[in-house]
Amino acid sequence: HWEIGDQNGHLYLAASGPNEIYSHWFKNLKPGDTFTSVPVAVSLTDQGFDDAVGTMTKYRRIIRRPNADNESLKIIFNDYMNCLWGHPTAAEEFPLIDAAAEAGCEYFCIDAGWYADGDWWDAVGDWRESKKRFPNGVREITDYIRSKGMIPGVWLELEVMGINCHMAQEVPDDWFFMRHGKRVYDRSRYQLDYRNLEVRAYADSVIDRLIKEYGVGYIKMDYNIEPGIGTDLHADSAGDGMLSHERAYLKWLEAVFKRYPDLVIENCSSGGLRMDYAMLSRYSIQSTSDQDDYRYYCTIAANSPSALTPEQSAIWSYPLREGDREEVVFNMVNAMLLRIHQSGHLAELTQERRDLVKEALDIYKTIRKDIKNSVPIWPIGLSQFHDEWTCLGLQSENKIYLAVWRRNGNK
């Protein structure tokens, strides 16, 4: 819990680790036991907001896991946003792969749905390919992606299991969050408990199989439930179980990166949730939103470096089938100073609009070396969704890059 306020003419900041009031957390320490609270960092300055965030940006880079992804800032194409919407098929992927490669993308990620013939929400957990969607297997698609010079990726949600997944009926209750003797579920899914070594072994087996069978080098790791206050199984309190699970998950993640140091895993949670540096000190890239209107997305893009480093901030750019030249430009500028998550039906755009996408990606490749060393600035302040003008800047030692947007208005 943290709060900032003004009381009796004094500004105060209160920050604490888990507690019973705010986190349903209680832990009984026996003689000789120890407990380490969650870490916190505070940036103080008399030079204004930009300076405070710049200092925090540098700090975030220091505590982050060293990795090649945040040095190279490669461009990702993902087939979800304003494109396949979680219903991929082999026939639809091939033209997208061709168009993404032609535009200059370097990763190609198959998003949700590759593992189910139809509706899949409450049945996830097996992570086996759908032969209906991919008659010759997902490997045919990932091989084609590599033949086009890109690294293949897939979508996963490895912290949950659907209530109708056959595995959920076969494994014991201690695989899942429990409260009051019953499994915790939300939106027809159970929350897996990573304190359980069998759960971590299951998760390892999925990662190992996807890398071995499909040759993936990128995983979009999503999370779309709300598990509530935690689990009281083998814990002094629900919050104690929650924090212990979270720390076990982070240890599991560290072990994955130790086995596969070149693997890129994106942190995603219903768009841009769970954007904290417990996660982002491990993950190299973070989904920021599933906002599907590019005119609103510029506000999210412009403000995102206040919460994470620019090179970790993944921004969707999705030219529309029915759009025009200015719509493409607006879309591409959304992502130009951050991490490009290209999407949209690129193969169906006019040649002029496809050329604009390629031009933007070519320019991005010339400036991304500066993004990883820059700090954000906001010349006209943080953006709000109703603002006519929005601006984000990145400042390096000898350069300033500016992204400027105008939406609506008559100027």
Feature locations, PLM:
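N-terminal accessory beta-strand-rich subdomains and adjacent acidic, glycine-rich linkers
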Residues: 1-59, 65, 376-379, 411
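Hydrophobic beta-strand core residues of beta-sandwich domains
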Residues: 29, 132-135, 402
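Glycine-rich, histidine-containing beta strand-loop boundary motifs that form or position
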Residues: 39, 111-112, 154-158, 223, ...
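Flexible loop/turn segments at secondary-structure boundaries
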Residues: 44, 48-49, 83-86, 100, ...
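Aromatic-lined carbohydrate-binding/catalytic grooves of carbohydrate-active enzymes
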Residues: 70-204, 214, 218, 235
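Active-site neighborhood of glycoside hydrolase catalytic domains
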Residues: 130-137, 141, 147, 169-329, ...
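Contiguous C-terminal substrate-recognition/catalytic subdomains in enzyme active sites
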Residues: 339-388
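Carbohydrate-binding surface patches
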Residues: 383-411
